[in-house]
Amino acid sequence: MSTTPARTLDTEELEQRVKHMYQEVALEPEREFHFETGRALAERLGYPAADLDRIPAAAIDSFAGVGHFLDLADIAPGDAVLDLGSGSGMDSFLASLAAGPDGRVIGVDMTDEQLAKATRLAAEAGIENAEFRSGYIEEPPVEAASVNCVISNGVINLSPDKAAVFAAVAKALRPGGRLALADIVSTEQLPEGVTCDASLWAACIGGAMQRDRYREAIEGAGLQIVEWRENRVYRFVSERADNAVRKYGVTSISLLARHPE
């Protein structure tokens, strides 16, 4: 009796689709995507308008995050912060305000257009304590035990190797350091037809890990989850995404985890 071979995700196709998607977010943020972008989204998610007023507006235009978490990050003056999947820099710039002149923020992204935009905006705004590096979130180009806090917004779901991401987070954090993020997870395990569809991954659906497995991946890296909350105000804007939300409980969450002392 013959069996149908299991489908697998084409990770090269995934990378190209994700890069293309976020090239467009950087260059043409006014376009329609499978997800919301911009200042109205940021404010609805909970970003204070007064804070947004202090950073480059063009970075906010290309914001495509899924939740607010900087209150959990509790970034203090002098902190070193790593932003995984920093995009056009909105969260990095906000973190740089909290870290102050004695702190520093390192944003890491694999999309050249996002990196170029964030670097240009930092230079134009005179933001000297934020820099942006090309790299992958599974292997960010930072030294071990070099940061107080790792942040990420709507990006880890795009990685086909989330365990590697959380291992990299644990490696980068100093003892007692913090991981604060927003991401997409699911209540139910997504079927193969969804998890092997690179286009749905690029739309922040296909890579949504079942929430218990997501927690296990974090804890498996030696991090301790302190707080976990749902971002009920976040919504998808495509019909395919809405179907996944209804059928599999795909949702946005924010969390705080700590590296042991």
Spans of model-derived segments:
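Short, glycine-/aromatic-enriched active-site segment of Class I SAM-dependent methyltransferases
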Residues: V185-I205
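Conserved SAM-binding strand-loop segment of SAM-dependent methyltransferases
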Residues: A125-E138
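N-terminal auxiliary segments of SAM/dcSAM-dependent transferases
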Residues: M1-L45
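A short glycine-rich, Lys/Arg-flanked "PGG" loop and its adjoining helix->strand segment in the class I
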Residues: A163-R178
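A short SAM/SAH-binding and catalytic strip from SAM-dependent methyltransferases
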Residues: N148-D161
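A short acidic, Gly/Pro-enriched loop at the edge of an enzyme's catalytic core
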Residues: P77, E138-C149
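Conserved alpha-helix/loop element of class I SAM-dependent methyltransferases that forms part
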Residues: F35-A80, D91-L94, A98
